[in-house]
């Protein structure tokens, strides 16, 4: 069965209100990558982030809750010590709120950060997702640099071309942000289009799962 892995970045509240109910209805799994951004950003925008209660509900519903750092910093520009602190802070936040220790990670902003790999391995992560528009080939791709397609805007052909690359052994990983996105309009996706995309996956008999589901299969 062809596999598509759904990932959602930045803990946007619309993922809880709009995305998760539809995924539950369709029987789809997904990974939600959580960050908190910096204090100044949160002071203005915290209402657009999921709360601990909402994260716990997603976890109870069987979705994967994963680490996207605390401040959403571009890791290539920081030392291992700073990276480790970012990862520890987010792990602690999740576990203090009743979420299991994360096993998946996503690089903020998308680019692979080689300087983060040793830190991720020390903290027992199974995989780390970057963003580059190609399918994941387990035989050749490093699990600490998973490729993924960023799905946003209004381009159904891009979505269809992305999922067409999936097969039983080589899943396609998709990255979404807000549906809709309230603060970062360049990664916005309309709910009607998201619903259309999920219908394509359902009608196409794709296996739709989280990163954790794939790596712990």
Write out the residue ranges for each language-model feature.
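Boundary/entry segment of secreted carbohydrate-active catalytic domains
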Residues: 2-14
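Metal-dependent polysaccharide deacetylase catalytic core of the NodB/CE4 family, i.e.
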Residues: 3, 24-126, 134-146, 169-181
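Glycan-processing catalytic domains of CAZymes
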Residues: 7, 67, 127-129, 133, ...
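Short beta->alpha connector loops
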Residues: 10-13, 108-112, 151-154
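Aromatic/hydrophobic pocket-lining residues that form the small-molecule binding cavity
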Residues: 15-16, 51, 83, 87, ...
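Histidine-anchored nucleotide/phosphate-binding helix
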Residues: 16-23
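Catalytic grooves of carbohydrate-active enzymes
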Residues: 151-213
């Amino acid at each position: 069965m062809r596999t598509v892995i759904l990932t959602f970045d930045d803990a946007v509240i619309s993922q809880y209100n709009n995305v998760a109910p539809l995924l539950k209805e369709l029987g789809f799994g997904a990974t939600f990558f959580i960050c908190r951004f910096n204090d100044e950003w949160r002071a203005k925008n915290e209402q657009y982030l999921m709360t601990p209660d909402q994260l716990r509900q997603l976890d109870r519903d069987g979705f994967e809750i994963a680490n996207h750092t605390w401040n959403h910093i571009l890791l290539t520009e920081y030392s291992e010590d700073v990276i480790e602190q970012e990862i520890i802070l987010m792990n602690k936040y999740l576990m203090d709120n009743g979420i299991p220790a994360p096993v998946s990670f996503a690089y903020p902003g998308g680019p692979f950060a080689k300087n983060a790999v040793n830190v991720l391995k020390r903290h027992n992560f199974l995989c780390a997702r970057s963003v580059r528009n190609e399918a994941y080939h387990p035989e050749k791709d490093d699990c600490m640099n998973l490729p993924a397609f960023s799905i946003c805007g209004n381009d159904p052909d891009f979505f269809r071309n992305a999922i067409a690359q999936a097969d039983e052994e080589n899943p396609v990983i998709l990255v979404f942000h807000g549906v809709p996105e309230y603060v970062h309009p360049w990664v916005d996706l309309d709910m009607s289009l998201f619903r259309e995309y999920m219908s394509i996956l359902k009608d196409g008999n794709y296996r739709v799962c989280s990163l954790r589901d794939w790596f712990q299969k």
